[in-house]
C-alpha cells in the first residue's frame, strides 16, 4: 500500500524532556508523536515496550519524557520518530498544549480496566480541536485501549472503544504492553494514517495491511 518502506535500526536514543540527542542532530527531520492519557493507563509502558522492548511492573508517574527512534528509508533518507510521553496529570495544561501544537500525530490511551480513564480523554480531545483547528482533520490519531491482558477486570468493552474511534474517524486498537501485544501494530497503523509523508515500519506488517491510510476527524 505504501511505496516507501522505512525500517527501524537496532539502536534507539532516549532522552528526558529538554535534553539534547545526537540522534536528533543527525536527523533531517523529526516525526513527532505525542502520547496522551490518564495516569496509570500505560503510556510509558507502551512507549518503552516499543522503543526499548522492555516492561516495568512498577508505576512511576511521568511529567514528560521524549524517546527517539531512528528510522532509515530504503532511499537512504533519515527520519527520527520522536515520541513524547506526556503527563497524565491535569496540573500541566501548558505542557499538554505545547505537545499538541508541536505534534504531527497523536496516540490517545485509556485502560480497558478503568472507565474513568476513558472519560478523561474528552478534555484532551477538546484541547486538540482547539489547538489544531481545521488541521486536526488531516492529523493521524490512534485511540488505544491498553491492558487487554486483564480481561477479568475489563470495564470498557471493545465495542465502546470502536464506536468512539468510528465517531472520530480515527484508528483503534487494543494493546497489552505487559504481553507485548499489538504494540508494533499500533505504531504501524499510526504511520499508515499519515497522508503528507509515506511512512511505514518494515517489521511484521511491511505493507501496512493493518492500517488504513486516511485522515482523522474529531467531531
From Swiss-Prot:
Residues 217-219 form a propeptide. The keyword GTP-binding applies. One of its GO terms (molecular function) is GDP binding. Expressed specifically in neurons including the nerve ring, ventral and dorsal nerve cord motor neurons and tail ganglia. One of its GO terms (biological process) is signal transduction. It comes from the Eukaryota. GTP binds at residues 37-44, 56-62, 85-89, 146-149, 177-178. It is a lipid-anchor. A motif (Effector region) lies at residues 59-67. It is found in: Cell membrane. Keywords: Cell membrane, GTP-binding, Lipoprotein, Membrane, Methylation, Nucleotide-binding, Prenylation. Its main location: membrane. Belongs to the small GTPase superfamily. Di-Ras family. Interacts with epac-1 (via C-terminus). Displays low GTPase activity and exists predominantly in the GTP-bound form. Together with epac-1, may regulate acetylcholine release at the neuromuscular junctions probably downstream of G-protein gsa-1 and adenylate cyclase acy-1. This is GTP-binding protein drn-1. It comes from Caenorhabditis elegans.
Amino acid at each position: 500500500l505504501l511505496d516507501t518502506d522505512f525500517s527501524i535500526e537496532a539502536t534507539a536514543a532516549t532522552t528526558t524532556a529538554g535534553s539534547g540527542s545526537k540522534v536528533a542532530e543527525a536527523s533531517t527531520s523529526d516525526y513527532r508523536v505525542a502520547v496522551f492519557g490518564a495516569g496509570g493507563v500505560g503510556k510509558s509502558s507502551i512507549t518503552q515496550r516499543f522503543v526499548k522492548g522492555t516492561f516495568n511492573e512498577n508505576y512511576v508517574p511521568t511529567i514528560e519524557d521524549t524517546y527517539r527512534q531512528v528510522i532509515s528509508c530504503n532511499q537512504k533518507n533519515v527520519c527520527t520518530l520522536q515520541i513524547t510521553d506526556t503527563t497524565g496529570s491535569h496540573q500541566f495544561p501548558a505542557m499538554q498544549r505545547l505537545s499538541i501544537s508541536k505534534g504531527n500525530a497523536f496516540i490517545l490511551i485509556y485502560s480497558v480496566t478503568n472507565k474513568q480513564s476513558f472519560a478523561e480523554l474528552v478534555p484532551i480531545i477538546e484541547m486538540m480541536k482547539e489547538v489544531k483547528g481545521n488541521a486536526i482533520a488531516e492529523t493521524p490519531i490512534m485511540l488505544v485501549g491498553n491492558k487487554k491482558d486483564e480481561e477479568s477486570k475489563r470495564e470498557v468493552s471493545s465495542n465502546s472503544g470502536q464506536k468512539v474511534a468510528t465517531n472520530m474517524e480515527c484508528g483503534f486498537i487494543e494493546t497489552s504492553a505487559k504481553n507485548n501485544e499489538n504494540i508494533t501494530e499500533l505504531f504501524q497503523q499510526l504511520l499508515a494514517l499519515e497522508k503528507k509523508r509515506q511512512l511505514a515500519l518494515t517489521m511484521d506488517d511491511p505493507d501496512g495491511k493493518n492500517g488504513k491510510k486516511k485522515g482523522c476527524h474529531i467531531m
